[in-house]
């Protein structure tokens, strides 16, 4: 895909004013672009770094058209906007990310079928439309398996683990509320992710492979570079995905590595991702920089340089309560507080990145600091 480059001083519209929108806006502004953000929350984080703010719901057609009329290009920070609404916007306005990826990825079943058709390795799965399909899941997948809603759900929401017959009732409850997907539960050795930007003329730029740890289904920590030799294999899988899904901008593919050292594609985030936040300090370009370059039609760097290994820690509300008094004592902690008005224990309130020559020692230091809040 080839499209015109935006000149300095052009206006970028962002649908979604959370922390991702905020960091997109900051990258856009340092490149000389103006930013208009649309979000339903009057005190969303991006509002305070944008040139203009439109307070409206994401399905407010009038407000979305207002955004389109004000901007030379539109991007979005999350995948929960209506795919149909986005398709209509794409017909009238310049939205390089497009709607196709959103349309595919909002449905877990379609996502997995697309990934499988693309030739990537995915965890065995089946469609579960009604309670009787659970028997098929038991027969096909065996215990344990996970039941996930087809639509919605993030940070572990909308899913239940079925270890044995005693857990089936929880699976039935979920199926009563939504069509679902059942997938085999893996004995996971490690979780990794690969952040990628696709730009003008199908330029592809890869970030280093990221090693992730989740706690309570929320990203807890990212280490870069990943301490496992899976970069080439992950890139091969991502290249297959790129051939199957239209997308311009930054996106992330999450992987599982099982106890047999097999790499499986888990899911795709069609926008900058939490596990790529380290790139702001640790790389010569951040994932937000390359995203803005891509959606404005600029050339991408041929490669991303990791300036120094890094450990990135998410900061939840409970972590801020524990660590607030320590931040000033650690200038090596690159701190990002998102500016959310309401602090909740399990809400992402910020992140911090530590550049280090010894990720193992820094990891242990972080465990010691964070253990009181987990």
Swiss-Prot record:
Gene Ontology CC, one term: cytosol
ATP-binding listed as a keyword: yes
Top-level taxon of origin: Bacteria
UniProt KW keywords: ATP-binding, Ligase, Nucleotide-binding, Purine biosynthesis
Residues that, per the record, bind ATP: 108, 148, 153-159, 183-186, 191, 214, 266-267
The protein's enzyme class: ligase
EC nos: 6.3.4.18
GO biological process: 'de novo' IMP biosynthetic process
Domain spans labelled ATP-grasp: 112-296
Similarity annotation: Belongs to the PurK/PurT family.
Assembly, per entry: Homodimer.
Biological role: Catalyzes the ATP-dependent conversion of 5-aminoimidazole ribonucleotide (AIR) and HCO(3)(-) to N5-carboxyaminoimidazole ribonucleotide (N5-CAIR).
Protein name stated in the entry: N5-carboxyaminoimidazole ribonucleotide synthase
Protein source organism: Staphylococcus aureus (strain COL)
